[in-house]
UniProtKB/Swiss-Prot annotation:
Positions with a binding annotation for Mg(2+) 3: 442, 446, 450
Protein name: (-)-5-epieremophilene synthase STPS3
Function: Sesquiterpene synthase that catalyzes the conversion of farnesyl diphosphate to (-)-5-epi-eremophilene.
Catalytic activities: (2E,6E)-farnesyl diphosphate = (-)-5-epi-eremophilene + diphosphate
Length: 546
């Protein structure tokens, strides 16, 4: 290139190094311990199956058991049995106006039915509304019931004002009474106010609930033992997978070749594990981790290093998807381009063996779309152009990366058929809602840092200019957009649905990762020390004490 390296002014971001070094490459497989745990879990599974069968005739008892299994993180062993139970119970059309069903029970049943796609009406909460249309004052002493109502309200859809009111009432009251509640309820309330169950990462929530359940006087020691064993067994599997992707990442050696990019392979695996933690998704987790890691480098190349002449060429090279394009590329990005094409060659070979090579095609096309949108953003930055909010959002829904990551989350899922990829390519309502959440929450968390780096074409800036709004008003509007998008996701997860529940759950879980990663308006991916490090240690380093 005519321009020398010295003359190039690059938008360097100076990202912090990895927190983990080679920690996960030095992995003790723990094969003997895993085998021992496996046998114990299989024995305990039989006993739990008996418990599920025994609770057949008692609605309240059975629903409490299902909730406990789900919160302890062991319900995936009994998905078929739980779905059968819930289908049966929902068909009973229980009269929840009966005084024998208290607020805790009604809220719990509502949440469980909604979580599993059943269209139970929010009108069942009407009996707790007074003549002025407010929730009754007497509920303020019912901490357990209010917590159950609070968690249920996060399953609301658009137009359910009774649940909007329920969330406001329960949140305010729980904040007020939390210091006066006894443990473990107080701990559960404090945690829920920070991290609502429906928005949380299932493994993190299971880890937290196991410690809370252990304090419960009414706990079932048998279930507690099962949950701990299973948690540690899954952790062993996840550590093996993390070892594999960490070794792959180290062998690529892109950290030394592209020192400007974020070194976040462990955090990328954390994201993939949040999308699916169950054993049968092992290959899918590894494939998704690799695609997220590579996307992170592309993002940083456009956002934090490349100049427009280089990015023009790189965008064309991705569009043409041909190894011969390497000769045209800037030297620094050649190793990455080669590694990216080779990764997808491996994917295609593996998927072709099971007749699913089309999955790689859809992923590549989605990546091309992402890169085109990154290129648009880069040109805005270079030109100092601040687009109208509508124009910004159209492009930014793609650069949030979730279009691409939802597609690549299905690469290793054998049950995902071509129709699923075609559905995602059409940008259905469920996916768009997910993209909105990812975009606006990311924009809130990264606004100040991007502003410091001279990024003018941000969503917050665009919205403020278009609407003559303050930063506080813009942030409030973005949270409102996210809240409405969550309502749309909840609606789209309800039955009947023509779409695969397996695919819907991938989108839902991707949004949960956003809620966790950007908790407290922090960018936990770029700066993982505060937000993600404690979770990663709990999930992949320290086993639960038996």
């Amino acid at each position: 290139m005519a321009t020398t390296q010295v003359e190039i002014q690059r938008p360097i971001a100076n990202f912090s190094p990895s927190l983990w070094g080679d920690q996960f490459i030095k992995n003790d497989s723990g094969a003997k311990a895993a085998e021992k745990h496996c046998k114990a879990v299989e024995e305990l599974k039989k006993e739990v199956m008996n418990m599920i069968t025994a609770a057949e005739s008692n609605l309240v008892e059975a629903m409490n058991l299902i909730d406990t299994l789900e919160r302890l993180g062991i319900s995936y062993h009994f998905e078929k049995e739980i779905d059968q139970k819930l289908n049966h119970f929902f068909s009973l059309n229980t009269d929840y106006s009966d005084e024998s069903y208290d607020l805790y029970t009604v809220s719990l049943h509502f949440r469980l039915f909604r979580q599993h796609g059943h269209r139970i009406s929010s009108d069942i909460f009407g009996r707790w509304i007074d003549e002025s249309g407010k929730f009754k004052e007497g509920l303020k002493t019912d901490g357990k019931g209010l917590l159950s109502l609070y968690e249920a309200s996060y399953l609301r859809t658009r137009g359910e004002t009774i649940l909007d009111d329920a969330l406001e009432f329960a949140t305010a009251t729980l904040n007020s009474i939390a210091p006066h509640l006894e443990s473990p309820l107080s701990k559960q309330v404090v945690h829920a106010l920070i991290q609502p169950l429906h928005y949380g990462n299932p493994r993190i929530e299971a880890h937290n609930f196991i410690s809370i359940y252990e304090e419960n006087q009414d706990k079932n020691e048998f279930l507690l033992k099962f949950a701990k064993l299973d948690y540690n067994l899954l952790q062993m599997l996840h550590k093996e997978e993390l070892h594999e992707v960490s070794r792959w990442w180290k062998e690529l050696d892109l950290v030394s070749k592209l020192p400007y990019a974020r070194d976040r392979v462990v955090e990328c695996f954390f994201w993939a594990m949040g999308v699916y933690h169950e054993p049968q998704y092992s290959r899918a987790r590894i494939m998704l981790t690799k695609t997220i890691t590579m996307t992170s480098i592309i993002d940083d190349t456009y956002d934090a290093y490349g100049v427009i002449e280089e990015l023009d060429i790189f965008t064309e090279a991705i569009e043409r998807w041909n190894i011969e394009e390497m000769d045209r590329l800037p030297e620094y990005v050649k190793p990455f381009y080669k590694a990216l094409l080779e990764l997808y060659e491996q994917f295609e070979e593996e998927l072709a063996e099971e007749g699913r090579s089309y999955a790689a095609h859809y992923a590549i096309e989605s990546l091309k779309e992402l890169v085109r949108s990154y290129h648009v953003e880069a040109k805005w930055f270079i030109q100092g152009y601040l687009p109208p909010f509508e124009e910004y959002l159209k492009n930014a829904l793609i650069t949030c990366t979730y279009c691409y990551h939802t597609t690549t989350s299905l690469l290793g899922v054998e049950s995902a058929v071509e129709e699923d990829f075609q559905w995602l390519a059409k940008k259905p309502k469920m996916l768009v809602a997910g993209l909105l959440i990812c975009r606006v929450i990311d924009d809130i968390a990264t606004y100040e840092v991007e502003k410091e780096r001279g990024q003018s074409a941000t969503g917050i800036e665009s919205y403020m200019r278009d609407n003559n709004a303050t930063i506080e008003e813009a942030v409030a509007k973005f949270f409102e957009i996210a809240t409405d998008a969550w309502k749309d996701i909840n609606e789209e997860c309800l039955m009947p649905s023509p779409y695969s529940r397996d695919v819907l759950m991938r989108i839902l879980n991707l949004e949960r990762i956003i809620d966790v990663t950007y908790k407290g308006n922090e960018d936990g991916y770029t700066q993982p020390e505060k937000v993600l490090k404690p979770h990663i240690i709990a999930l992949f380093v320290d086993p639960i004490k038996m």
